[in-house]
């Protein structure tokens, strides 16, 4: 009898929760239509996987890619609409958030065709891989629009947990297991530090969790200049610094890049930085509005450390993926300049434009590493020597992406860095910009060193990996070559059309 009553109570409570969720989705669903499309794609993937066999594998790629493209389309149709707050203040929709959501969707859309050949050759489980990619994308999109501390944390952990699972996806690989363990432990520690910072904000603001209400609460309690705010700022900066791979919180990055499957590294190298940058801009700009001088100083120090350490240590690396790991640490230091400049002097517009170029440059480089690794089984920089003699297209396209990452004209990376540094110079960040320019020159050195190896024709320098190199036919109908071509074009042509792209970013933001 007691069990029967408890069962009825459980059913009634479950029904109320379901009806409340349905009511919220019915009246607020249009505000998260791109996210809803991804959720529908996830459900469809699970249903097909449970009722199909291996012959239906192409459908998994098609459904995932279609969901992402439809989500981008829904986002573009919503462009330039008035800012809206939905779900009882938990989620905010505006142009600024939507730009970051677009960048995350673009990363995922390019990463899926980049991953197909690798998955086919290594015989990895396809369904789970795509589920983790889509769920991480979903977490990143919710993180961009999150408007309160709880939603920020849940969305961040959704993205982080999928990242941990993806990094350890090749569970029989010892290096992958080591990378996952380090990533999980350090990621958990950084999340704890971040939440501790959130708890200080919650307490000092009088129990507020919405970002704008935290500011109002700090004014009401007159705690906006208290030592507690400085403590909260330090803890939150450390937590976000880990997510962005800023020095000195970058120790996990090289090991995770080296041990994880290459398509996973390509995905994490761009999406994690886009999502964390979106979080950083909103967290620092809104709750810490009254502490702008303090967080500017903190970010300047971290950016300088990242640019110097990242680029100097990259010179000594022998693994291509580890070199790109340290390179990405230096690259995020450049992005921080845009965050510090902010609304003034087109800081955000130049930062977003550079991140768009960085996505193309980085994914283009990783696409070539995937293809070279599948054909030779090596990741050593020395083993790329003489690749031009065997595969000119692969060597030239890799060289273009590396030159663009280094910032040589007339490629996209040069114009992206030029405008970012110019915005920083106008804002008075002379020392920071000077360090950025010097470290950019250093980065050109190690990129050119790789390009020199690619183009060498001397037999004594060509390794057996390249001597025995064979352009084996692709199993996946040239999907990886599609990503390669798109990324190469995006890494070169936008340099010529920099002004229109920047004008679109400025017009959208302001």
Curated annotation (Swiss-Prot):
Question: Which topology term describes how it sits in the membrane?
Answer: Multi-pass membrane protein
User: What are its E.C. numbers?
Assistant: 7.1.1.-
Q: Give any single GO term for biological process.
A: ATP synthesis coupled electron transport
TM helices/strands, residue ranges: 24-44, 59-79, 99-119, 124-144, 149-169, 184-204, 229-249, 262-284, 295-315, 323-343, 354-374, 395-415, 418-438
Places the protein is found? Plastid, Chloroplast thylakoid membrane
Keyword annotations of the record: Chloroplast, Membrane, NAD, NADP, Plastid, Plastoquinone, Quinone, Thylakoid, Translocase, Transmembrane, Transmembrane helix, Transport
Query: Main localization of the protein?
Result: plastid
InterPro entries assigned to the protein according to its UniProt record, in alphabetical order: NADH-Q_OxRdtase_suN/2, ND/Mrp_TM, Ndh2_N
| Recorded GO MF terms | NADH dehydrogenase (ubiquinone) activity; quinone binding
Q: Which GO terms describe its cellular component?
A: chloroplast thylakoid membrane
Q: Which reaction does it catalyse?
A: a plastoquinone + NADH + (n+1) H(+)(in) = a plastoquinol + NAD(+) + n H(+)(out); a plastoquinone + NADPH + (n+1) H(+)(in) = a plastoquinol + NADP(+) + n H(+)(out)
Record's function text: NDH shuttles electrons from NAD(P)H:plastoquinone, via FMN and iron-sulfur (Fe-S) centers, to quinones in the photosynthetic chain and possibly in a chloroplast respiratory chain. The immediate electron acceptor for the enzyme in this species is believed to be plastoquinone. Couples the redox reaction to proton translocation, and thus conserves the redox energy in a proton gradient.
The subunit field of the Swiss-Prot or TrEMBL record says: NDH is composed of at least 16 different subunits, 5 of which are encoded in the nucleus.
The similarity comment for this entry is:
Belongs to the complex I subunit 2 family.
Annotated protein name in UniProt: NAD(P)H-quinone oxidoreductase subunit 2 A, chloroplastic
């Amino acid at each position: 009898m007691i069990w029967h009553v408890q069962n009825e109570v459980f059913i009634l409570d479950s029904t109320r929760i379901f009806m409340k969720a349905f009511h919220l989705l019915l009246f607020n669903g249009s505000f998260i239509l791109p996210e809803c499309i991804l959720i529908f794609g996830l459900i469809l993937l699970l249903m097909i996987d449970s009722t199909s066999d291996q012959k239906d594998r192409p459908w998994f790629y098609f459904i995932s890619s279609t969901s992402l493209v439809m989500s981008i389309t829904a986002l573009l149709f919503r462009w330039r609409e008035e800012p809206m707050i939905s779900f009882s203040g938990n989620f905010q929709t505006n142009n600024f958030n939507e730009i970051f959501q677009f960048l995350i969707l673009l990363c995922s859309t390019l990463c899926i065709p980049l991953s197909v050949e690798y998955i086919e050759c290594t015989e990895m489980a396809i369904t789970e891989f795509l589920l983790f990619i889509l769920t991480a994308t979903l977490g990143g999109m919710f993180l961009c629009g999150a408007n309160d501390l709880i939603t920020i944390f849940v969305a961040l952990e959704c993205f982080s947990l999928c990242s941990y699972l993806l990094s350890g996806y090749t569970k029989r690989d010892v290096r992958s297991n080591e990378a996952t363990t380090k990533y999980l432990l350090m990621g958990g520690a950084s999340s704890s530090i971040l939440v501790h910072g959130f708890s200080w904000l919650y307490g000092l603001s009088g129990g507020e969790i919405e970002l704008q209400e935290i500011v109002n609460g700090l004014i009401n309690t007159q705690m906006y200049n208290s030592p507690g705010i400085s403590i909260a700022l330090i803890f939150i900066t450390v937590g976000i610094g880990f997510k962005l791979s800023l020095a000195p919180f970058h120790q996990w990055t090289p090991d995770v890049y080296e041990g994880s499957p290459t398509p996973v590294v390509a995905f994490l190298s761009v999406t994690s930085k886009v999502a964390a940058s979106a979080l950083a801009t909103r967290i620092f700009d809104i709750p810490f509005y009254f502490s702008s001088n303090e967080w500017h100083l903190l970010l300047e120090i971290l950016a300088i450390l990242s640019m110097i350490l990242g680029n100097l240590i990259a010179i000594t690396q022998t693994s291509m993926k580890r070199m790109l790991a340290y390179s990405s640490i230096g690259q995020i230091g450049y992005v921080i300049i845009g965050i510090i400049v902010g609304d003034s002097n087109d800081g955000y517009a130049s930062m977003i434009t550079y991140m768009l170029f960085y996505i193309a440059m980085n994914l283009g480089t990783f696409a070539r590493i995937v293809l070279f690794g599948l054909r030779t089984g090596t990741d050593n920089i020395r083993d790329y020597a003489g690749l031009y003699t065997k595969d000119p297209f692969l060597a030239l396209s890799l060289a273009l992406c590396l030159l663009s990452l280094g910032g040589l004209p007339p490629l996209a990376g040069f114009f992206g860095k030029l405008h970012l540094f110019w915005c920083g110079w106008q804002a008075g960040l002379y020392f920071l910009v000077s360090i950025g320019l010097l470290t950019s020159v250093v980065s050109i050195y190690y990129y050119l060193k790789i390009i020199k190896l690619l183009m060498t024709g001397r037999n004594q320098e060509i390794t057996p990996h390249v001597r025995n190199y064979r352009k084996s036919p692709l199993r996946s109908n040239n999907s990886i070559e599609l990503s390669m071509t798109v990324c190469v074009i995006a890494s070169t042509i936008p340099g010529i059309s920099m002004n229109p792209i920047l004008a679109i970013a400025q017009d959208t933001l302001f």
